[in-house]
Amino acid sequence: MQPAIQVWFGEDLPLSPRSPLTPRHGPGLANVCQYDEWIAVRHEATLLPMQEDLSIWLSGLLGIKVKAEKLLEELDNGVLLCQLIDVLQNMVKTCNSEESGNFPMRKVPCKKDAASGSFFARDNTANFLHWCRDIGVDETYLFESEGLVLHKDPRQVYLCLLEIGRIVSRYGVEPPVLVKLEKEIELEETLLNTSGPEDSISIPKSCCRHEELHEAVKHIAEDPPCSCSHRFSIEYLSEGRYRLGDKILFIRMLHGKHVMVRVGGGWDTLQGFLLKYDPCRILQFATLEQKILAFQKGVSNESVPDSPARTPQPPEMNPLSAVNMFQKQNSKPSVPVSIPKSKEKQGRPPGALVPASSLKGGNLGSMSVRSKLPNSPAASSHPKLKSSKGITKKPQAPSNNASSSLASLNPVGKNTSSPALPRTAPCISESPRKCISSPNTPKAKVIPAQNSADLPESTLLPNKCSGKTQPKYLKHNHISSRDNAVSHLAAHSNSSSKCPKLPKANIPVRPKPSFQSSAKMTKTSSKTIATGLGTQSQPSDGAPQAKPVPAQKLKSALNLNQPVSVSSVSPVKATQKSKDKNIVSATKKQPQNKSAFQKTGPSSLKSPGRTPLSIVSLPQSSTKTQTAPKSAQTVAKSQHSTKGPPRSGKTPASIRKPPSSVKDADSGDKKPTAKKKEDDDHYFVMTGSKKPRK
């Protein structure tokens, strides 16, 4: 203990750049562990005067040498404390026989061979504490048995012994020197309060010499030298009485080497007091906590490299958030954000999944259409069809059919038909839901190629012409059946079975085989869109512009279960034609179409009559058309059933379709009336059944 205190408080400690302060100020905060150690040593240093005083007092009472440095080790087994009880009781009896009656006298049991830290040591300590309570020691001065046995609370042990000295001093027993100094100070304070400073000066200071005390105070006050404007002033008032800053305190010399300051009911060293109250020295203590915290933060920032968790990670693109972004930027060309295929599958489970290859090959037509569209963001995002597909999936979580239609709608609406995007984007979520109800008829007709082509139109129409677009798609189905009766029937059955949710978008696919007829349909659909939606007619115009893609590409797109934008170009044309034909009946048949969609079943269950036909055609679900030619009625039925998740498209059917569709395109012009009659009859039957429901 002594060497450590000498190191911290001695005058020979060399100063280093890291600890520029004098030893009395401590080592500074360059090393927190070293500073903590110094704080502990400083606390022990303030205890050292009490340790020495108590060791001298106990040595005199017990007649044995008690070392101040090992005071706790001497007391921790409780044997000396029990012996102290016997000595004090005997001294009280001999010193003051009259007052001894008030002092409790009793035999305290003691295990004299108790080992340090043992249960018997705790038992001895507990017996001592019980006696302390009997003689009137206040609870504030008492300590726990563990505090002494394990050396946890030395200060409290010393304060308890000092309190015992105060109590026994009333019975004529010599107390510790600190207790004597307390009595002198109390007497001086009493004289100061009653008379004046002159009387207090006459009080004999038995424990200190005036000259030595004053020199010691001056030395401590001037070390280190301070030239601060707010220098802490120490003013001499009288012998042992000084003004320290704004406080008047009593200072005493203990055993000729410790300058002690009476603070409250206890004692502190003058050095420790100045460290706490001197503005020049308080820096290391009053702001100790803040400084240590700041220092630790600085160390952690400098030494610990930024962990990956700390480094800001780019936010993960949320499909819905991406959709919202596109809606806001619908007027501007936007690049869709690519989404993992796994996410795409989740977005459009039924038939919305579109492999990258199909997007590239199957969507060529749709890409060209988008690029041609004046405002379509797709023009700028042709290479990112995959991402657009992923985006379309995002708003379509509500249902498989809706998701598939949205898959086609979103890429097209966002990429293909930017003019309608402002309107379509906000309603994308609504259109998918509506598409669910109306996809039934278009589902059978939905073909990957038309999906992308029709998507622009449908995306343009979803908000305003949801009702009209549905009839148009129905017309598309009829027209395509006329042009491509066999191929359309196969396409309807395939798309309906495979792409239940993307029927509308798939319906334009039927026109795939007949690129010419699809082009015509796109023209008509553009006209109908213009009449029905006004601004939506622009995307339809863009759709006819889309270049048709070979039937093989359309087949591959269908096989890949991807929205075939290429094939969609031709279906777009066909759909446009059908839309032109159905524009007149669109307004009339909208309720019918809605009711028909409701009848169709799964699609009507989701949102019967809500989804516009344009929305239905929008979905770019990858559906493989089946070659099996069916009647227009079977096509419509299959379209209704296609609302279920699109099954893996049949590649052979799709392969067959292109040629058949080409033939149908030729025959579509010749036999449009017959197919129209069949389709119209079936359509009217469906509508009639739904009208009574409405």
From Swiss-Prot:
Signal peptide: none annotated. It is found in: Cytoplasm; Cytoplasm, Cytoskeleton. Residues 299-694 are annotated as: Disordered. Transmembrane segments: none annotated. The modification Phosphothreonine is found at residue 441. InterPro entries: CH_dom, CH_dom_sf, GAR_dom, GAR_dom_sf. Expressed in the pancreas, heart, liver, placenta, brain, skeletal muscle, kidney and lung. Residues 48-168 form the Calponin-homology (CH) domain. Residues 663-683 have a biased composition (Basic and acidic residues). SUPFAM superfamilies: Calponin-homology domain, CH-domain, GAS2 domain-like. GO terms for molecular function: actin binding; actin filament binding; microtubule binding. GO terms for cellular component: actin cytoskeleton; cytoplasm; microtubule; microtubule cytoskeleton. Cytoskeletal linker protein. May promote and stabilize the formation of the actin and microtubule network. This is GAS2-like protein 3. It comes from Homo sapiens. The gene is GAS2L3.
